Design a protein with these regions (language model features):
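Alpha-helical transmembrane segments of integral membrane proteins
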Residues: 26-35, 57, 61-68, 101-105, ...
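Transmembrane helix-loop-helix hairpins at the membrane interface
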Residues: 134-263
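C-terminal TM-helix exit segments that contain a strictly Trp-centered aromatic cap at the helix terminus
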Residues: 42-43, 117, 179, 183
């Protein structure tokens, strides 16, 4: 069967759908390449000029690395005409009226992440006080939270196979993993695991969790909050790098996603 088998109107609708899909796919590809390249360049600048990680310059550049997904998303959104100005961009990202479910999920996702890890006995408690959590929490807005604007709010919405949730999350997890590599090449950064397979699996699990949350959110704030909570709770308890337990940790969000997002 080809386009000749359809009526003229049906052919036009199919062509429009294909054009829109290709357009979204191109945007997603160019966004990913731009964000990855920009992060790599900034990372190399840090390694060349601030290798010891003890100056104000490397701190500012490290913050910039974490902001690149949001900055690139803002540039793409405005250039493509999806938002008319920076003000409208921030309004769509931060000032949407979210459902009660999205807020509940934002707090429940860290419970899932650490709760399953505790049940699997794959957590090491650091011994830090609860005060350390509250002191670190604001910093995670810059060191992780705002990257959700790029990954969930922008690129997740632009992947061409938008109705195929699992496929979309698999692709997004690869991009997110590649983006982290220049960051974890910095000598003073401690990654979740020095084993890239385990590190990717941890990213894969969080991709499904945050991705599912975005399906119920309009803006990026619920995803930002969930990301900040997971990062901040690491001050109190660290998920360990046991491959078997990490696989089980990933299986749960994958199965839930397969149940609720069947395509």
């Amino acid at each position: 069967m080809d386009l000749k088998d359809f009526t003229e109107n049906e052919q036009e609708e199919i062509e429009k759908g294909l054009s829109k899909s290709i357009s979204k796919q191109s945007v997603a590809i160019w966004y990913a390449l731009t964000a990855l390249l920009a992060t790599y360049i900034v990372g190399q600048v840090i390694l060349w000029f601030f290798p010891d990680g003890s100056s104000m310059g490397d701190s500012l550049l490290f913050i910039l690395m974490n902001l690149i997904p949001m900055i690139v998303a803002a540039c793409f959104s405005i250039v493509l005409g999806e938002t008319k100005s920076l003000g409208e961009f921030f309004k769509k990202v931060f000032f949407q009226k979210e459902s009660n479910l999205s807020w509940i999920l934002a707090f429940f996702i860290p419970v899932i992440y650490y709760g399953i890890s505790i049940l699997l006995m794959n957590v090491r408690f650091t011994g830090n006080s609860l005060l350390a959590f509250f002191l670190y929490f604001p910093w995670t807005f810059l060191y992780g939270g705002l990257e959700e604007v790029g990954w969930r709010w922008f690129i997740q919405e632009h992947l061409s196979f938008s109705k195929h949730f699992i496929s979309k999350m698999m692709v997004l997890s690869l991009v997110w993993f590649l983006w982290h590599i220049p960051i974890y090449q910095l000598p003073w950064i401690t990654a979740g695991s020095s084993n890239y397979l385990i590190f990717y699996l941890m990213i894969l699990g969080n991709t499904f969790l945050f991705g599912a949350l975005k399906e119920y959110s309009k803006g990026a704030v619920p995803c930002i909050l969930a990301h900040m909570l997971i990062d901040s709770l690491a001050v109190l308890m660290l998920v360990q790098s046991s491959l078997t337990q990490i696989i089980f940790l990933v299986i749960f969000p994958f199965m839930v996603s397969a149940l609720f997002f069947k395509k």
